[in-house]
Each structure stands twice: as C-alpha cells, then as structure tokens.
C-alpha cells in the first residue's frame, strides 16, 4: 500500500479558478489518487473538470465522471464557462468525446478499458445505493490508474467512509485501517454497519490517524483551511426553525395506553411516531411552504403521497420513477419551471445547486449527513438571501434532534482534527525505546 504520488505535474489551470482551487487541482493531479473533501460551493465541479482535462493532456485518453441524478447538466454548463467542449453526457454507454459523464445508475453500460481516469462526484452517495451498484462502482474504480473521489465533509465519526475511500483509492484497506488505528469494545471484529458502536480510535493513534487521512485527501470547509483568503466565501444567514407536532394518538407501551406521549427511544418506536403523525406533519409543512419556492424533504412514500395530495402543484420524486423522469423533474426545478418539489434526501440530497430557492421543509431522521447535504442545496456560496429551514417533527421524536445536535458537534471536531493535522507526516515509531522512525510496511 503505497502512499506516494501516482500523478504528474498539472499542465492546465483554468483562468477562472480561485487560488485555493488552483492549489487543489495541482495537488490532486500530482497525487493521481486522492479524495477531495471540499464543502459545498467551493467549486468541486470546476476542479473535477480541470482534473479530467489535465489527464487528457497528459495521456490523450478518456476520463469518466460519475455523478448523481441530474447533476451531469451542471458539469456541461460549467465546462462551457471554462471553454472546454470535449465533454459529453452519455446515458447509454456510447461516447465520442474525451470527458464522459454518466450517472452512477448507468455505470453498467461502460467498460473500464475505455478510460484511464475516473472521478466520483459526491462519492458519499455510494452508501445510499444497493449492494449491486456499490459493487459495480468499487470494481470499476479499482481497475483505473487515475482515481479521484469528490464529496463534502465526511459524516462525523463515519470511519467506514474514510476506510472505504482509502481502499478505493488503492491505499490502506478498510480492515487494515481498523486493525491499525481502532480498538474493538467487544473484542471481536464486528461488521461494517456497527463500527460506530463497536470501534473507537485508540487514544495514542488519534493524531497519526488524521495525519494518515491527510496523506491521501484534501479537506476544507473554507479557503482559509488551505491557507487562502475567505473573501467572497461568506455565507448568508441560516435560520433553522423547529416545529414540534403533538402526537394525540394513544400510544401503547407494554400493553398499556399512555396519557402522555413517551419519547421514542428505539428505531421501532421512532417509526411508530412517524407513522402516527405523518398527516399532521404534512399539513404543517404545507402551511410553512405557503406558496413559496420550496422543497419538501420527506422520508417515506406515504409522506410523499400526502404532501402531493395537500399540495397538488408540487412535483414528486419517487423511487419507482424512471431515471429519465427523475432527471426531467429535477432539471425543471433547477431551471425555475417548478415551484415546489417533494423528494427524499437519500435520493436527491447531493450535488444539486439550488441557490434560486431559499426555503425548505425537512422531516429529520438520525442521519446527520442527509440533513447537512439537504440544507446545503440552498445554503451555499452564491445564495443571495437568508436560508430558512423548517424542521417538522413530533413531540415523541425529540431525541432525533438531540442526536443531530451531538453529531453536528462531532462533525466540527472531525473537521478540526483533519485540518489541524494537514501538515503532519504519518510515521510510525517501532518501539518506545527505539528513536529510529520507520515507515510501516504498507507505505
């Protein structure tokens, strides 16, 4: 597992690139395999197109960019601004130009041998796909020489994402990462899904862990994280309002009906709360949107159907729709042809730029990342107005809000750790009494 450079010196930096973007392009190209954890609005689209163009100038071969639904159009618009026309969006695997964009869902149409570089836009979205698509992407990426992952800040304590990102880039594997830096509470290896509960960073390995992550990634929430000026990157005000809906249905606990609604503690209880309050929450949402340009972020098909019933002028995005239909609706909303959209954060919460909209209604879940990404569709650089997010939740689900607050604090801590250790060199002391510093075998 080498952690050296696999790339080359950059040959092309767009004239319109800011200094921190130029730095990111140069470092990424030199590295050849890197994860860019840049927050929303920092120009990841421009950076990715520039990376692709550099690979073409160096190799005269093709680069594939994988994107979430409806994001491909944003790449075409950005490329036009940059003066790059050797780019196309392919929906069926046919391509004639050097930079090829496709959706994750359409990857099965493409062959690895046709590409020398691959860029995963919003790579965090992989966790939302079923096993088949995830396996296809992983297998595809591992066969490509130049690999780039691009997404916003990793979820707080989502070490799974960091481990799988490292593995996809060809560095330390997920299980090797666990062995090297983590300790198991139950003294067993456990599964990937419960790492948050079963594993924790070894105290003495914490700084080394974050230094290691920084050997194969770039992370920034603001240009200043990379040593540049924040001028022009100050966000407008974000206002988050909590609307607590009283659950007036009788709740059964251990066979007894409760006069007062107990706080839901388990996933089963939370789902029961969601189900028993869905109409009241939807009614409140319609009241809050009140004819504005807005997005309703819901979680279930039932909620989506009720919202559509109560707001007939809104358009739905649902899983059963064809890819083409979803793209059509999402593009229409982005172009201002649709005023209100009903969708789910796990489906359309990543990659889309909706600065024309500054209001949203959100049904919170345990997922910090889904909420963060959903909010950042509107609250991003280029937004001219204050952004209002109305969270609607039942009185029995307040633990969800508490959990999200805790995860927000952890996200801030994760960002602090990664940026503080950005210049640390990852080394390993063989023994305490041995002053000689040795690189571990995987380097």
Task: Enumerate the language-model features and the residues they cover.
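Walker A/P-loop
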Residues: 31-51
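Conserved helicase ATPase core of P-loop NTP-dependent helicases/translocases
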Residues: 295-297, 305-306, 312-348
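Conserved P-loop NTPase motor "coupling/switch" region that bridges the ATPase
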Residues: 60-62, 81, 117, 125, ...
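Conserved helicase/translocase motor-coupling segment
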Residues: 226-315, 319
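A conserved SF2-helicase RecA2
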Residues: 366-443
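Conserved pre-motif I regulatory segment
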Residues: 2-37
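Conserved helix-turn-beta segment of the N-terminal RecA-like "Helicase ATP-binding" lobe
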Residues: 70-93, 171-172
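Conserved Walker A/P-loop ATP-binding site and its immediately adjacent core
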Residues: 45-50, 60-81, 156-161, 300-301
């Amino acid at each position: 597992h080498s952690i050296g450079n696999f790339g080359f010196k950059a040959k092309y930096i767009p004239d319109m690139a800011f200094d921190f973007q130029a730095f990111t392009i140069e470092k990424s190209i030199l590295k050849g395999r890197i994860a860019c954890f840049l927050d929303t609005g920092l120009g990841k689209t421009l950076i990715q197109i520039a990376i692709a163009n550099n690979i073409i100038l160096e190799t005269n071969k093709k680069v594939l960019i994988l994107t979430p639904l409806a994001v491909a159009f944003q790449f075409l618009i950005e490329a036009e601004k940059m003066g790059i026309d050797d780019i196309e969006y392919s929906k069926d695997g046919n391509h004639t130009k050097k930079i090829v964009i496709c959706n994750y869902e359409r990857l099965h149409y493409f062959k690895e041998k046709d590409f020398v570089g691959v860029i995963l836009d919003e790579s965090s979205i992989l966790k939302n796909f079923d096993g088949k698509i995830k396996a296809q992407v992983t297998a595809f990426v591992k066969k490509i020489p130049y690999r780039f992952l691009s997404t916003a800040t990793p979820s707080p304590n989502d070490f799974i994402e960091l481990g799988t990102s490292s593995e996809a880039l060809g560095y330390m594997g997920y299980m090797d990462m666990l062995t090297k830096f983590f300790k198991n509470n139950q003294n067993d290896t456990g599964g990937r899904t419960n790492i948050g509960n079963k594993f924790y960073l070894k105290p003495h390995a914490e700084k080394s862990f974050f230094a290691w992550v920084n050997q194969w990634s770039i992370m920034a929430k603001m240009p200043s994280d990379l040593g540049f000026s924040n001028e022009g990157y100050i966000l407008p005000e974000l206002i988050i309002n909590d609307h607590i809906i009283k659950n007036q249905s009788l709740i059964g606990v251990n066979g007894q009906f409760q006069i007062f609604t107990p706080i839901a503690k388990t996933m089963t209880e939370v789902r029961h709360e969601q189900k028993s309050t869905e109409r009241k929450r939807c009614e409140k949402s319609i009241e809050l949107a009140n004819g504005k340009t807005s997005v309703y972020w819901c979680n279930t098909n039932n909620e989506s159907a009720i919202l559509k019933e109560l707001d007939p002028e809104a358009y739905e995005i649902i899983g059963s729709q064809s890819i083409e239909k979803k793209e059509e609706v999402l593009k229409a909303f982005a172009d201002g042809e649709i005023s209100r959209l009903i969708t789910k954060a796990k489906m359309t919460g990543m990659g889309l730029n909706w600065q024309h909209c500054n209001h949203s209604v959100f049904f919170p879940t345990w997922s910090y990342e889904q909420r963060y990404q959903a909010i950042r569709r509107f609250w991003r650089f280029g937004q001219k107005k204050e952004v209002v997010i109305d969270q609607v939740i039942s009185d029995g689900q307040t633990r969800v809000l508490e959990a999200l607050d805790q995860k927000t604090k952890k996200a801030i801590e994760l960002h602090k750790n990664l940026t503080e250790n950005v210049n640390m060199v990852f080394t390993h002391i063989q023994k305490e009494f041995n002053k000689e510093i040795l690189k571990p075998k995987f380097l």
